[in-house]
Amino acid sequence: MAYYQNTGLPTAASMVVTPAMSDVSQEDPGEGFGPSKLGVRTTVDEPLSASQAIEVLQAGNRRFVQGDVKAGGLGPDMRRALASHGQRPVATVIGCADSRCPVEQLFDARPGDLFVLRNAGNTCTHAEGSMVGSVEYSVAILETKMILVLGHTGCGAIMGATKLFLERSTQKYIEMTCRKDAQESTDQSTEASEFEQPPQPGCCKKKSTLLGLLDALVPVAEQACVELEGGSTEEIAAHAVKVNVWRTINFLLSYSLIIREKVASGEVELQGAVYNMSSGAVEFLGKSPKQAQLLNYDGHVVPSMGGLARQVS
């Protein structure tokens, strides 16, 4: 937490914790999402260990799959408890923005149970971006011990990146073949080929942010294509979902000093999972196969937001 002492962000020590409200017990708290003293997870509760957190996540998903959810609603006293006592989430989940993948629901969780971060493709592409900074906040300040990167079947971002990679690969092959044929031809044309024509007015447009997002995921599709040689577009995209989960985990281990150090010390665990939209089940993948290699790397680690804050302090 000292990493953030000069950032202006609230620390657990600065959060006001008042005595438990006497009428909270009169509400029906359901079975909750891990142990809680006020019916909801707040700073009154102790952080759960990584192993405890993963067990709670697994149990919640089993209830979701079976249609036996226990989270229930929030009464007025529970809402006041969350507003007054701060947050102590069980785990941090990096999920996809897909509207069909409601992270809290598929783990049978309520407000205050999970610290959820979502974007298209459940990915981290910038060492100093808001996603990395938010994960650091969750482990350094909120004291979550489990970070779960959650991909899902049928991911549109991954499919888009896969199609983009395959289209570019095909176009590159065509261009290389055409260039080779032109060079070997004895009948050289004086006219410029289509590849040498200057761009026409209006044909070049500024690259969209969406295309930039897909570009960042193209290496994932490329790796999946190599590992699944000869696979169909759908098969490659399905495999790329897992590849992308590992890539996000490896990115966090490589570019966040806070996360890297907490994982190395055993205080925090970083694991992957994939949500099956058809069955509702979450496949827990465990730790990255490259975790030990990345933690043993002695080279320069690009400072993350928290790392910079620590260097300045």
Annotate each language-model stretch with its function:
Residues 73-75, 98, 102:
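Poly-acidic low-complexity segments
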Residues 88-91, 96:
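Glycine/small-residue-rich phosphate/adenosyl-binding loop
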